[in-house]
Amino acid sequence: MAGRLAGFLMLLGLASQGPAPAYAGKMKVVEEPNTFGLNNPFLPQASRLQPKREPSAVSGPLHLFRLAGKCFSLVESTYKYEFCPFHNVTQHEQTFRWNAYSGILGIWHEWEIINNTFKGMWMTDGDSCHSRSRQSKVELTCGKINRLAHVSEPSTCVYALTFETPLVCHPHSLLVYPTLSEALQQRWDQVEQDLADELITPQGYEKLLRVLFEDAGYLKVPGETHPTQLAGGSKGLGLETLDNCRKAHAELSQEVQRLTSLLQQHGIPHTQPTETTHSQHLGQQLPIGAIAAEHLRSDPGLRGNIL
């Protein structure tokens, strides 16, 4: 009985002292990668990587189209690089810092063509780097599997990537001529014949081929602007090639005819705006000599170089 009473008094004494201090026990520290950076999936979309524009249309050899929609990564040092063919190149810093860097090193722009062969893919208009935008050139080489093999920065804000793929191992896999439409192949044949007949100079030959590659959608016309990236917006009108422009023009013409017919059916009067050509407009303001001088100033120099 005395033992039970002593035990009860001991418990009562401990209870009167209150709970143990919070710091009395040991604290277990769990380290986890932070999610405060730009790749935090819980951040709003506006806080993530924001491209300056839409990528160019997928173009080039048909057997490479299967790479579209896929991405390949490579970790070098503390950075993870990701190459998405026909889309973009990105860089992500692998660190526990709250402000880890993630950025776009370039968006799909055009092919690099040397000796009538596809040599590389240019990714431009990446994130700002000092007074310019980052850009990358991706070289395609033969390999057993699809993989991003190497990344370097040969000059400030300009990156060089090597992508290995079995899709380019055949010696003719990157030739430009077989990828062209029959009409463009005939144009190329004529250019070759004109060069052989000395009707054009080598400089004119190169210019004509560049125009041909631009019409095929492999190269961009100098000064051509890309559709900008708009949140929730469309991806542009798809006027990357001459054929697409012609198709869009035909569709617009049909729409105009349909609307005109609709107005006529309902007896609604309409007038067709008069058109004034550029030459007529100049003729009203400038003498003939000035028109000729203006034409020479605006001449791109192609004819003078190829004859």
Swiss-Prot record:
GO terms for biological process: carbohydrate phosphorylation. Changing C84S: Abolishes homodimerization. Does not affect homodimerization. GO terms for molecular function: protein homodimerization activity. The keyword Nucleotidyltransferase does not apply. The keyword Iron does not apply. Widely expressed. Highly expressed in the liver, intestine, brain, thymus, testis and ovary. Transmembrane segments: none annotated. Keywords: Disulfide bond, Glycoprotein, Golgi apparatus, Secreted, Signal. Residues 1-24 form the signal peptide. Residues 69-171 form the MRH domain. Cys-245 mediates the formation of the interchain disulfide bond for formation of the homodimer. Cys-142, Cys-157 and Cys-169 are involved in intramolecular disulfide bonds formation. Residues 176-279 form the DMAP1-binding domain. Disulfide bonds join C71-C84, C129-C157, C142-C169. One of its GO terms (cellular component) is Golgi apparatus. Changing C142S: Does not affect homodimerization. Its main location: secreted. It is found in: Secreted; Golgi apparatus. Glycans are attached at N88, N115. Non-catalytic subunit of the N-acetylglucosamine-1-phosphotransferase complex, an enzyme that catalyzes the formation of mannose 6-phosphate (M6P) markers on high mannose type oligosaccharides in the Golgi apparatus. Binds and presents the high mannose glycans of the acceptor to the catalytic alpha and beta subunits (GNPTAB). Enhances the rate of N-acetylglucosamine-1-phosphate transfer to the oligosaccharides of acid hydrolase acceptors. Homodimer; disulfide-linked. Hexamer of two alpha (GNPTAB), two beta (GNPTAB) and two gamma (GNPTG) subunits; disulfide-linked. The alpha and/or the beta subunits of the enzyme constitute the catalytic subunits. This is N-acetylglucosamine-1-phosphotransferase subunit gamma. It comes from Mus musculus.
